[in-house]
Amino acid sequence: HTPSAEMNLEGNVRIGTHYMDKHFTPDAFDFKGKYNTADYYLSITPFSWVELAYTCTLQKMHRRDNQGNIISDEGRYYYQDRYFSIKIRPLKEGKWWPAIAVGANDPLGTLGDKGTSHDNMTPTNGDGKSEYFCNYYIAATKHFAFKVGELGVHAAYRNWKRDYNSKWNGVVGGITYSPSFARNLRTIAEYTGNEVNIGADCLLWKHLLIQASLQECRYFSGGI
């Protein structure tokens, strides 16, 4: 949930999906109240210093026709919120200094300032609160090797575009730990600016990454 300066290996391509508890998503991501959802994504690292991703998050709301008229009052996952992400690492981690990265999620936003349509038109998604995940950040990461494992320290300054995400603005960060007896396992603790989350991920057979987390140390989200 919080950014870091870590990058995937050059040439890596990742596809995955996650279940997300409603406490994980922005407060404005709602339909008659907040709801659990899921996303799926594609991530590529064409060079060691840049990472690109495309994410789709299932969105529950009224079904509408091409003119924006409601044709079904029942709320289902008829729509998806889509956005691009980019991370650039101008400084690689060294022995005495951290890696530094800058990045953004949904930097292009929408065509209009009222939703997912042109200005002065009715938003096609009907809520006028899009750009749910739009944020910008600068992050630093440093790893420390010990006999018992590797400790990662991550810090970032992040700014969200929408006011309803302001609780996550400012300084955020976390720590990661990989034990020496299981280098493919990593435990995580982070502060998002508003809550503390814990989690873990595990790489199996060099290709399958399993991830799990507890938002506010209580609410489960996870995926591959």
Task: Describe every region a protein language model picked out.
Residues 1-136, 141-147, 159, 179-185, ...:
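Transmembrane beta-barrel domains of Gram-negative outer membranes and organellar outer membranes
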Residues 108, 216-218:
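Charged, glycine-enriched surface loops/patches
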Residues 149-151, 204:
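Beta-strand-turn-beta hairpins that frame and shape the catalytic cleft
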Residues 152-173, 181:
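Glycine-rich phosphate-binding "P-loop"
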Residues 169-178, 182-214, 221-224:
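Outer membrane beta-barrel transmembrane domains
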